[in-house]
């Protein structure tokens, strides 16, 4: 536990991250994909036995795995990249990861456990967030499935998956639950401006729905650098009531945003809420040590409502 906290602290305080890189196809020049190691619980080979789901196994989800007594949904990552929310019943079997070894990355984020079927693990890469840029909004990323890109080596790039988008696609009923929850929250009376830093299109849509329902003014930025530039430009900080920031973002991380705001005498009083899918104790403790005013597991509507009501009152 202490080792995990030290590792997390070292990476975040230096504006760095580590990504597990993997491939979905056997070709030598196959595209590489990645995800933050802090969202990964373990990597396993399963025996191929999966509890099937109603409606068959021709969609994104293959069924359920039993991992250490826990039933976890198994997703074929290649199928998900070809999934279109406008055609949810499409047969995706032809897009499957073709592998007899049943290699699976078991993940935990946003209070969800999920198993991802991939073809091959490459290695972990260590990057500064300044070396990471936003993913192009074209091709398979038209629906926001890629949050960022970075270099694997001189010749190849890694596409970082937007796991928040994956969760919303795999569990569409969560959106219905969110819509019901939104009906239960009341508007907050405040003229203060809310600044949001979020690179995930899926997560940003949820946040925007929340603040719009609360009838609050806001501006959203795709990364922490743009938020900070705006905050200190023309003394905009005088109009701001609270900052909500993700942790994983191209250019600079949410922890860097938090550190900068709290270290500047002009903004040290400004409430900063961390909204992250990386909900480990080590991340929470680091946020608290850096004087974050709140930590929300992305994006808990009721918790965000309560924190905004408290900070804006």
Swiss-Prot record:
PROSITE patterns: CHEW, RESPONSE_REGULATORY. The keyword Hydrolase does not apply. It comes from Helicobacter pylori (strain ATCC 700392 / 26695). Keywords: Phosphoprotein. This is Chemotaxis protein CheV2. Disulfide bonds: none annotated. One of its GO terms (biological process) is phosphorelay signal transduction system. Residues 193-313 form the Response regulatory domain.
């Amino acid at each position: 536990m202490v080792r995990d906290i030290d590792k997390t602290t070292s990476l975040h305080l230096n504006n760095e991250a580590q990504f597990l890189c993997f491939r979905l196809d056997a070709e030598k020049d196959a595209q590489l994909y990645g995800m933050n190691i802090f969202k990964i619980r373990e990597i396993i080979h399963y025996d191929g036995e999966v509890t099937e789901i109603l409606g068959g196994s021709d969609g994104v989800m293959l069924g359920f795995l039993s991992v250490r007594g826990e039933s976890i949904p198994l997703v074929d990552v290649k199928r998900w990249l070809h999934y279109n929310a406008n055609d949810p019943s499409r047969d995706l079997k032809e897009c499957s990861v073709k592998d007899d070894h049943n290699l699976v990355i078991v993940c935990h984020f946003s209070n969800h456990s999920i198993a991802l079927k991939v073809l091959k693990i490459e290695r972990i890469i260590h990057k500064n967030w300044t070396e990471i840029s936003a993913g192009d909004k074209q091709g398979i990323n038209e629906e926001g499935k890629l949050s960022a890109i970075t270099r694997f080596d001189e010749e190849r790039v890694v596409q970082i998956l937007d796991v928040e988008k994956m969760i919303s696609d795999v569990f569409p009923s969560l959106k219905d639950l969110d819509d019901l929850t939104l009906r239960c929250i009341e508007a907050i009376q405040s003229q203060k401006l809310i600044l949001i830093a979020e690179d995930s299109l899926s997560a940003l849509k949820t946040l925007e729905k929340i603040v719009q329902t609360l009838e609050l003014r806001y501006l959203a930025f795709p990364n922490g650098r743009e938020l900070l530039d705006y905050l200190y430009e023309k003394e905009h900080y005088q109009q701001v009531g609270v900052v909500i920031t993700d942790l994983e973002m191209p250019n600079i991380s949410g922890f860097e945003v938090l550190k900068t705001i709290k270290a500047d005498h002009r903004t040290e009083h400004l409430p900063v809420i961390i909204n992250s899918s990386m909900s480990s104790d080590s991340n929470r403790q680091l946020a608290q040590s850096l004087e974050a005013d709140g930590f929300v597991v992305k994006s808990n509507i009721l918790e965000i409502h309560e924190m905004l009501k408290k900070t804006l009152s």
